[in-house]
Amino acid sequence: MDPCDCSKTGTCNCGATCKCTNCQCTTCKKSCCSCCPSGCSKCASGCVCKGNSCDSSCCQ
């Protein structure tokens, strides 16, 4: 289950490095909102995506 409901509420409890599109957080886990770019089909569970990049540690 996702740790927050960004798609429903538009907000979530996050920090300060992640660029999110559908919520007003600046840092979040992948399951919180779409931090990773469209090229990243799936992020590792519990992964914190940093910035707009998605590397091998975040993707699987």
Swiss-Prot record:
Residues that hold a divalent metal cation 7 according to the record: C49, C54, C58, C59
Entry-linked PROSITE patterns: METALLOTHIONEIN_VRT
Pfam families: Metallothio
GO molecular function: metal ion binding
UniProt keyword annotation of Metal-binding present: yes
Ligand binding (a divalent metal cation 4): C32, C33, C43, C47
Organism, scientific name: Barbatula barbatula
Alphabetical list of InterPro entries matching this protein: Metalthion_dom_sf, Metalthion_dom_sf_vert, Metalthion_vert, Metalthion_vert_metal_BS
Known function: Metallothioneins have a high content of cysteine residues that bind various heavy metals.
Ranges for region Beta: 1-28
UniProt lineage: Eukaryota, Metazoa, Chordata, Craniata, Vertebrata
Positions of the UniProt region annotated as Alpha: 29-60
Record: residues binding a divalent metal cation 1: C4, C6, C20, C23
Annotated positions binding a divalent metal cation 3: C14, C18, C23, C28
Annotated residues for binding of a divalent metal cation 5: C33, C35, C36, C49
Protein name: Metallothionein
Disulfide bonds: none
UniProtKB keywords: Metal-binding, Metal-thiolate cluster
Chain residues that bind a divalent metal cation 2: C6, C12, C14, C25
Comment block on domains: Class I metallothioneins contain 2 metal-binding domains: four divalent ions are chelated within cluster A of the alpha domain and are coordinated via cysteinyl thiolate bridges to 11 cysteine ligands. Cluster B, the corresponding region within the beta domain, can ligate three divalent ions to 9 cysteines.
